[in-house]
């Protein structure tokens, strides 16, 4: 029973300290993303969002092209 209390105290102290260190920045992010500046929402976060968007689109396009290539390669008979 004592071990249970000790473990609960440890979990409580770790979870509360981690929660107290982080400040709530939701209001700041809401102002940024709700601003009327004619940018798409996936680019309002700045350069990081732009890079992340381009990398994601490149990987998706590359995967699509590669899957079509593999389908084309598999659809023709192979010489043995």
Swiss-Prot record:
Pathway per the UniProt entry: Energy metabolism; oxidative phosphorylation
Cellular component aspect of the GO annotation: mitochondrial inner membrane; mitochondrion; respiratory chain complex; respiratory chain complex IV
Topology within the bilayer: Single-pass membrane protein
Spans within the Mitochondrial intermembrane topological domain: 76-80
Keywords of the record: Membrane, Mitochondrion, Mitochondrion inner membrane, Oxidoreductase, Transit peptide, Transmembrane, Transmembrane helix
GO MF, one example: cytochrome-c oxidase activity
Keyword Calcium: no
UniProt keyword annotation of DNA damage present: no
Major site of localization recorded for this protein: mitochondrion
Topological domain spans for side Mitochondrial matrix: 22-46
Organism superkingdom: Eukaryota
Transit peptide as recorded in UniProt: 1-21
Segments passing through the bilayer: 47-75
One Pfam family, short name: COX7a
GO biological process: mitochondrial electron transport, cytochrome c to oxygen; mitochondrial respirasome assembly
CDD domains: Cyt_c_Oxidase_VIIa
Location in the cell: Mitochondrion inner membrane
Subunit structure: Component of the complex IV (CIV, cytochrome c oxidase), a multisubunit enzyme composed of 14 subunits. The complex is composed of a catalytic core of 3 subunits MT-CO1, MT-CO2 and MT-CO3, encoded in the mitochondrial DNA, and 11 supernumerary subunits COX4I1 (or COX4I2), COX5A, COX5B, COX6A2 (or COX6A1), COX6B1 (or COX6B2), COX6C, COX7A1 (or COX7A2), COX7B, COX7C, COX8B and NDUFA4, which are encoded in the nuclear genome.
Annotated family: Belongs to the cytochrome c oxidase VIIa family.
Function comment: Component of the mitochondrial respiratory complex IV (CIV, also named cytochrome c oxidase complex), the last enzyme in the mitochondrial electron transport chain which drives oxidative phosphorylation. The CIV complex is the component of the respiratory chain that catalyzes the reduction of oxygen to water. Acts as an assembly factor that specifically drives the homodimerization of CIV complexes, mediating the formation of mitochondrial respiratory supercomplexes (respirasomes) containing two CIV: supercomplxes with two molecules of CIV show improved activity.
Protein name according to UniProt: Cytochrome c oxidase subunit 7A1, mitochondrial
